[in-house]
C-alpha cells in the first residue's frame, strides 16, 4: 500500500488532529481509567539550574550558551526523567499511565508542530476525559506545564498527588508555587507563566 504524503488536501486543523488522537485513545484507554504522569520538560528545576550555571535567564540565552548540547542537557534528560517517572507509577500497579513528555506532533505531521497553548489544551482534554488522577513529579512547582496540569486536574475533580503519592491540596499548591516564583525572581528570572498559573489557583475555593 502506498501512503500519500504532502497532499494539501490532507492538511488538518488543530481541532481535527486533537479529535483524531482522542479517538485513537478511545480504542485502548477507557474513560477515566488512566493516571497522568506530569513531569518537567521545557521549564523546570533542571532548566533553571542550568541557566544559573551558564549565566543565562531565558531558553534562548541558554540555547545560545550550550549550542547543540541544549537539547541533550535539558530536553533529552527531562524526557528520560518523565519516562522513568511513568515507569515507576506502572510498577506501583497503575495499568495505564500517560506521560506528555514523549508526545511530539511535528514528527507525525510533516514537521508542522502545535503551539505551546495547543499542546496544553490537548492535555487538558486528556486529563478531563481519560484520567482519574494526576501524579506530579518532584519539583513540579518550578515547571509551567506541571502547574497547569495541576490546574486542569483541579478543574475536573481529579486526585492530585505528588511523586510519593501524597495528596497535594490547593493551599499547599498555592504556597509551593508562590515560593517557587519568589525563589526564581530572586535569581532574576521572569516567570510570567507561573504568575498566570498562581492567579488561576487563587480563583479556586480551598477544600480540604
Tell me what each language-model feature is.
Residues 1-208:
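Conserved catalytic or regulatory cores that recognize and/or transform ribose-phosphate-containing ligands
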Amino acid at each position: 500500500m502506498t501512503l500519500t504524503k504532502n497532499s494539501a488536501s490532507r492538511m488538518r486543523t488543530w481541532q481535527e488532529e486533537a479529535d483524531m488522537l482522542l479517538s485513537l485513545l478511545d480504542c485502548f484507554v477507557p474513560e477515566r481509567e488512566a493516571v497522568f504522569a506530569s513531569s518537567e520538560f521545557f521549564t523546570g528545576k533542571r532548566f533553571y539550574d542550568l541557566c544559573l550555571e551558564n549565566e543565562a535567564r531565558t531558553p534562548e540565552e541558554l540555547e545560545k550558551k550550550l549550542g547543540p548540547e541544549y537539547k541533550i542537557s535539558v530536553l533529552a534528560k527531562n524526557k528520560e526523567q518523565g519516562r522513568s517517572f511513568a515507569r515507576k507509577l506502572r510498577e506501583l500497579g497503575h495499568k495505564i499511565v500517560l506521560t506528555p513528555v514523549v508526545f511530539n506532533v511535528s514528527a507525525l505531521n510533516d514537521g508542522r508542530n502545535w503551539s505551546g497553548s495547543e499542546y496544553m489544551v490537548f492535555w487538558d482534554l486528556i486529563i478531563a476525559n481519560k484520567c482519574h488522577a494526576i501524579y506530579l513529579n518532584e519539583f513540579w512547582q518550578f515547571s509551567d506545564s506541571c502547574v497547569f496540569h495541576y490546574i486542569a486536574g483541579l478543574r475536573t475533580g481529579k486526585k492530585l498527588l505528588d511523586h510519593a503519592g501524597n495528596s497535594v491540596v490547593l493551599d499547599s499548591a498555592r504556597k509551593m508555587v508562590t515560593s517557587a516564583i519568589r525563589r526564581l525572581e530572586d535569581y532574576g528570572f521572569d516567570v510570567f507563566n507561573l504568575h498566570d498559573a498562581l492567579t488561576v489557583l487563587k480563583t479556586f475555593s480551598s477544600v480540604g
